[in-house]
Amino acid sequence: MTRVALLTTGRELSQAAPPARARTPLPVPTPRGERPDDGGHAPHRDRRVNQRRRQVGDRRAQRGVDEHPWRRPDERPNDHLPQRNSERPEGVRGQRIRDAGDEALTDHRPQSAPFDLCIEAMGAIDTQQRLGVIPACAPAEKAGRVTKVSSSGPNSTPLPAARIGPGTNNAPSAADTTTYARGAIGPVATTIALRTPSTWMTRATATR
């Protein structure tokens, strides 16, 4: 009986299915840019993904504790670097570079004319005025006014004078005949004729 049982057990074992083997999983394809080790080898199309930053060290032999790494050893205390050629300093348009505080800025704006220059009036000049000819005028008795013309200067023109009737008490004690050419430097004097019952007297009044 024991022999029959063993034979039956052997047959069952031989007829039984073989044990299942462990299958290895197939590799899942992943994009090249997402792999952890591709940052330093294969650049991404964007050129900014998974890129390792370069470590830039101090190229100097020694650096003190209190010395900043961005400060050059040849930098001056005023934060100015030395000139590349000390015999011929750098320049812009032929001018030497100086400190901004010592540089005198040039004013290129249009300047007005100085006050000591005589500026002639714009416009057409009459031929008689250009030649200095005094135009004829009516007598004072008929025109009702007295006109005295300055005879000096290229722009000599008749200056009208006001008429003061007889009986006034503001007649000057002495006659002042000082006249100035129009456009000259100094006060412009207008000669006013004062008519009195006895004689004609002139007075110059200065205006600013």
Curated annotation (Swiss-Prot):
Region (Disordered): 1-95, 145-176
Keyword terms, alphabetized: Signal
GO cellular component: plasma membrane
Compositionally skewed regions (Polar residues) per UniProt: 148-158, 167-176
Keyword check for Membrane: no
Annotated S-S bridges: none
Signal sequence, start to end: 1-16
Biased composition (Basic residues): 44-54
Bias type Basic and acidic residues, positions: 32-43, 55-95
Comp. bias intervals (Low complexity): 16-25
Parts forming coiled coils: none
Domain of life: Bacteria
Protein's recorded name: Uncharacterized protein Rv2306c
